[in-house]
């Protein structure tokens, strides 16, 4: 038997006879492990490959059913209809062809399924063949142009008119931020949902709102974490507050989606959840204060500045806590409650939250002579500019403190603030002493603060101007946006002008009209793009439309995060979606049921249902990721958010195209 063995086998047997049993056993175990790895890899490869024929067989079965229907009637329109069904993965088409029992409450919708498939859009000047040969580029450019138009009309006209309305009605900042200002930031999504229900007769509105929600949670937070100038510490209360409401709203939405239809009372329940959030925001400060008093580690600490201590050259306890070398622009883990509605109500995308990142440390910033005439946005930008000056001057102040010693004189300036605290600001001086406020030690040159605030007033709070810019890049941008801005400037009064302030109703209703027109064109051209390249409106809503309508939120959140306001950026990303889920979706549904004699709305889309479930799962992953990053917005958190967003897009598209089958069937 030894004669028939190969030389390699004889050499191995000889080596094992001379080596210790352990050496031979190690060699045998390594071969065994390699064999196990190969088997596992083979099984995984078979599983991955098996998904392809399963998906192909599903499409083949669908096509065979449609082909059998075509064989009975080979007329031209029937063939064209079958061709549309193969290129557009629209669930309504498939239900029309082979679903045996449509919902009884939607009989009128089933009779007009052809119109619902195409939507109530005007006839395109380009045929499908011409669009496939290159004319679709014009539709893509027009769709992007509508993204810019929606951002401009909301930014320059709609939100300022809402600010005037809240001031006229005397609504508190918290309630205004959760109602009027939330509507201003989410107007594109709301009108897209209305168009999807009444004009497109598709789920494009649901896809846009769900995709926008994931974009705000994952992509926006990821961008804020990557582009912030420093690692930002986050606090738990704003995130806990908004996530709690958002989880309840998502669970309600998932439950209502289970039977493929939305009843009128289900829409009403979602709207009721929104009003509950508004009521909570009315008492947000009191609730937060009570909750943190119940939790010993987060007790609210009130810091007061004695008059004598503030003016004393040697004021300050050397053993007491001092401010870090660079003042933080967000709340730390042990900081007190910092809610200030003026800080929150200034930027329209962030109007749902009440956060004053420096109320504990800085109190208020000084009442300027033009403070009462400024809009909420101008007040925020003014304060943000002062904060920026404080951060820039801190290092110089510390150096002057060590070299020059005591201050000659301290000037007290009182400013309006919900916390009713005071701040000491020192005028310009070569030798100055810092004012110490518990853990605060700041020295600000008085000459710089007016300059900063005047600059913020001049640049950010001025009415819209159509003057020709001097910079070449700005001139090119001006030419691009001029066809949008000029009609708005002609038809809508700018309420930021004192003389036009009384015309705020015209601006309000006119802005709504323009938003409706821009949203209609955006959805129409997105439908044409999807029809040309062969994807459904639901996928367009989940991807392109969701990102396009959320660009203003992205830009504002990144700017706020770069200023150091990490809490405001993160909590707004979660809280801004509450309006979309509890108003943007149920309001069009409720209007539809009322108009159609309380008949339910069909939302039969297995891909979108799983997308909503994925949205809920991604929200849990966001909370877990923030906790694992120790409540800090760093680069790792940013890359995690980007990875989760990519996974959501891929899985959602595969589910909507039936390449993957949702494990939860409806």
Swiss-Prot record:
It is a multi-pass membrane protein. It is found in: Cell membrane. GO terms for biological process: calcium ion import across plasma membrane; calcium ion transport; cellular response to high light intensity; cone photoresponse recovery; establishment of localization in cell; intracellular calcium ion homeostasis; learning; long-term synaptic depression. Residues 1-38, 155-179, 227-237, 282-502, 560-574, 629-635 are cytoplasmic. The modification Phosphoserine is found at residues 337, 341. Disruption phenotype: Mice display a significant reduction in Ca(2+) flux in cortical neurons, leading to a profound loss of long term potentiation and an increase in long term depression at hippocampal Schaffer/CA1 synapses, and clear deficits in specific tests of motor learning and spatial working memory. Mice do not show any obvious loss of photoreceptor function in cones. Keywords: Antiport, Calcium, Calcium transport, Cell membrane, Glycoprotein, Ion transport, Membrane, Phosphoprotein, Potassium, Potassium transport, Repeat, Sodium, Sodium transport, Symport, Transmembrane, Transmembrane helix, Transport. Glycans are attached at residue 112. It catalyses: Ca(2+)(out) + K(+)(out) + 4 Na(+)(in) = Ca(2+)(in) + K(+)(in) + 4 Na(+)(out). Alpha- repeats lie at residues 175-215, 546-577. The keyword Glycosyltransferase does not apply. Residues 416-442 have a biased composition (Polar residues). Residues 63-122, 311-336, 397-467 are annotated as: Disordered. Residues 60-133, 201-205, 259-260, 524-538, 596-607, 657-666 are extracellular. One of its GO terms (molecular function) is symporter activity. Belongs to the Ca(2+):cation antiporter (CaCA) (TC 2.A.19) family. SLC24A subfamily. Calcium, potassium:sodium antiporter that transports 1 Ca(2+) and 1 K(+) in exchange for 4 Na(+). Required for learming and memory by regulating neuronal Ca(2+), which is essential for the development of synaptic plasticity. This is Sodium/potassium/calcium exchanger 2. It comes from Mus musculus (Mouse).
